[in-house]
Amino acid sequence: MKVESVTKEETKKPERKIKLAIAKPEDYSNKNVILEKEEELICPVCGSKNIIKDYERAEIVCEMCGCVLQQNLFDVGPEWRAFDHEQRVKRSRVGAPMTYTIHDKGLSTVIDWRNKDSYGKDISADKRAQLYRLRKWQRRIRVSDASERNLAFALSELDRIASKLGLPRNVRENAAVLYRGAVEKGLIRGRSIEGVAAAALYAACRRCKVPRTLDEIAEVSRVDRKEIGRTYRFISRELNIRLAPTNPVDYVPRFASELKLPGEVESKAISILQKAGEKGLTSGRGPTGVAAAAIYIASVLQGTRRTQREVADVAGVTEVTIRNRYKELTEHLDIDVTL
């Protein structure tokens, strides 16, 4: 029998090049702010996006077909474990995370205002004057030029308005990103810093589906409603911001909470607005007026009635607007309301 010799190259299996398709989703906190883009892996075998990280085996695996996309991962987390927030804060050895709401993104050093050392002991009286001077010069060197000074003022104004309106953290971050984008494109020249900050906050509220009206923002800012609206339209066009019309449903939780209405009324109002949207009754009408009318109808139907004046004061509309929207909703949705 003749045995043919097989070379090593002939026995070598053909290599299969695996190319990972990379997608970049918009992800920051609750997926409303575009700050950092994290790579999303797509399985090259089945095309699934259900990719899981197995920390015990240090592998990235496709949940659908089991293909191992990456192995021998490094654990970049802390070496300690914490079981509650208090332990996490106590054991952490790093500072606050980076934020866009501070002009230097929170990366510079800040001297604490309390006159205590690293052990928590009071600083002696003879060293307090020196600490005061260090603190003063530290504040000065954080702002190096006029542009940083203007940015610091704008972000402080933005934070002040957001605090007055009780807006969450993600809205503030989003507004800061929009304002920085306006600065980079030179959109601030010829306009007031307060006006651009208020307009950026209004756009961030709409993007994050935490709606606030122009009147509400103008009430706590130093500019009028007309200027905020004009600046908002300008920066939306220049920054290519595409925002859908405000949904009246987004106003219902806040209005219902201020009126101290139970959850049943809120759910009923949302149901009414969803049916109204399917029939096109919300198009071309102010979202606050439609939401106020739906809440008024729901409160009557659920036996926890609020007067039109009470609802109008919370929603920032007139009683006439509520009556007009009330008439449209009850007639087109066949809602029998006994007053």
From Swiss-Prot:
A zinc finger (TFIIB-type) spans 39-70. Sequence repeats lie at residues 156-239, 250-331. GO terms for cellular component: transcription preinitiation complex. GO terms for biological process: transcription preinitiation complex assembly. It comes from the Archaea. One of its GO terms (molecular function) is zinc ion binding. It holds the Pfam family Zn_Ribbon_TF. SUPFAM superfamilies: Cyclin-like, Zinc beta-ribbon. Zn(2+) binds at C43, C46, C62, C65. The keyword Zinc applies. Keywords: Metal-binding, Repeat, Transcription, Transcription regulation, Zinc, Zinc-finger. NCBIfam families: PRK00423.1 (NF001658). PANTHER family: TRANSCRIPTION INITIATION FACTOR IIB, TRANSCRIPTION INITIATION FACTOR IIB-RELATED. Stabilizes TBP binding to an archaeal box-A promoter. Also responsible for recruiting RNA polymerase II to the pre-initiation complex (DNA-TBP-TFIIB). Belongs to the TFIIB family. This is Transcription initiation factor IIB. It comes from Methanococcus maripaludis (strain C7 / ATCC BAA-1331). The gene is tfb.
